[in-house]
UniProtKB/Swiss-Prot annotation:
Species whose genome carries this gene: Rhodopseudomonas palustris (strain BisB18)
Gene: fbp
Complex and partners: Homotetramer.
Protein name: Fructose-1,6-bisphosphatase class 1
Family in the record: Belongs to the FBPase class 1 family.
Sequence positions that bind Mg(2+) 1: 91, 110, 112
The keyword Transferase appears for this protein: no
Amino acid sequence: MHQGLTLSRHTNEYAGTDKLRLAVAAAIDAIAAASIDISELIGRGPLAGITGEAQGSSNADGDVQKDLDVRCDEMILAGLQKIPYAALASEESETLVLGDPGAPISVAFDPLDGSSNIDTNMTVGTIFSIVPNKQGEAPFSAPGNVQLAAGFVVYGPQTSLVLTLGNGVDIFTLDRRDRTYKCIRQQVQIPEHTAEFAINASNHRHWEQPVRDFVEECLAGADGPRSKDFNMRWIGSLVAEAYRILTRGGIFLYPGDSRPGYGDGRLRLLYECHPMAFIIEQAGGGASTGRERVLDLAAKSIHQRAPLIMGSVDKVQRIELLHNDPAAATITAPLFGHRGLFRV
């Protein structure tokens, strides 16, 4: 652990004199600076006029916007206006913010993930993805495997920034005394054998059969096919779920399901699934839709959705197998069925 390593030193050493890397570093530094102000704003809560009440408008994806969503979006946009960019994509904006078409990078971000948790004083965060700009190609039209950097900020008991520059994952925690991010962990690797899974089990009746099969294998415990007792987690905040996986292992599932509008889940590909998949893979994990690698997907629209299953490689591979080979299922009696453990 290198507690003397600050985020700014880390990005400076990464950038050197390379034009593309300098632009990436500038974007990271701008988002980090905005996140410090966002952390202070969230920390003051109602004292700063922060509530979970809806503003009355909706974002491009149809979610009701809260005042804090808009304020965080404005703070990050203000920081990014100071750097060279070709395009910006925000969850809160229906269209792209266009900059210099000759700039080396474009940035996609979710300014405040999990904002519905604000009223309950739970974890929220910021997610971002930085991609190269190729002249002659539409911004953000390439698959996720072209990302140059990705990260997320967790506004929890501590404010921490998780970052990959394509060579592993490092975690920095905000030192509020001098408003700097300092490294607490380098080259994070996801633990392989943690018996935890995270999914919103209330949607069981809407899931595809492979997802049901996987969850039922976990719930069968030590006497079931996985031969161990699993714990279930669900926070409702993607950044919190991802941080737990990085530090403790396990698997997170937000699959598509049969509800209208949920065929591809609820998470957005560009600024949620792509950056999280990049981070998780760089930490030795896997990220899939259940059928294919998330980083192989290219977005056809800036707010396109995709299922996201991420975590320890063995668990991600297991659910991919269940999708691709239904005969691999080892449990036929549904734990949630008429004769199951969750009978009503």
